[in-house]
Amino acid sequence: MIEIVRLVTEHNAKMVGVTGRISIGKSTFARALVDALRREGETVQMISTDDFLYSDKELEEKKIRDPRGFPKTYDSASYEEFLTAVNNGDEATHRVYSHEIYDITDEKRTFRPQGITILEGVNLFYDEADEMAFRKYFDYVIYLDQDPKITWEFYFSRVHEHIAAAEDPDNFFYPFRSMSEAEIERISLEYWNDINMENDRRYIAPTKAYADLIVTLDRAHEISQLEESTPKKGVLR
């Protein structure tokens, strides 16, 4: 992490993006980077693209059928307003996503940019036309990479953690508590292959070419390799 801190600070980056496939550990990595930068005296804040998803109600009203996490399920107008404000050093208001109910809540927060902003999420750059128009707002982008088989194992272990913690009937994972292990695995694998890996193939993996740094993670989610890259320019269609 020391080397990554050096690269971020050498680039004088104020807006840092952390991306990669679902369940690869973006939030964990981003929090570790926040801590490492703060130890070097930097002022750092972190936010997730999850907070810019449409709510279930909005998805229904807009007749958006794409699975949550695909580019069209984000409120790209609000997201771009946020990116513009933060890049200008202005305050920005955003909504809050709940991983318990898997939906946007009624809570709103005010983000006051100071120092470095780390923004983590699966689809950092896409606008409403599925074009990678928002790359221009990021000074430095880190792409997390890993063997998909390892990521699936981590994803499935997290499913079990969520099920064990689901005590509220409104929790997305509460119904799983009455399912057999075979049924849990069948549903999880179906979701993983049909939604998560499809999102990865169509939208997430192509952003690797637009990253400044590719970080490969091993089975223990430790950094095994760093590869500096020259990001592509222009808009990805």
Model regions and ranges:
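NTP-dependent small-molecule kinase module
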Residues: 1-6, 112-113, 179-237
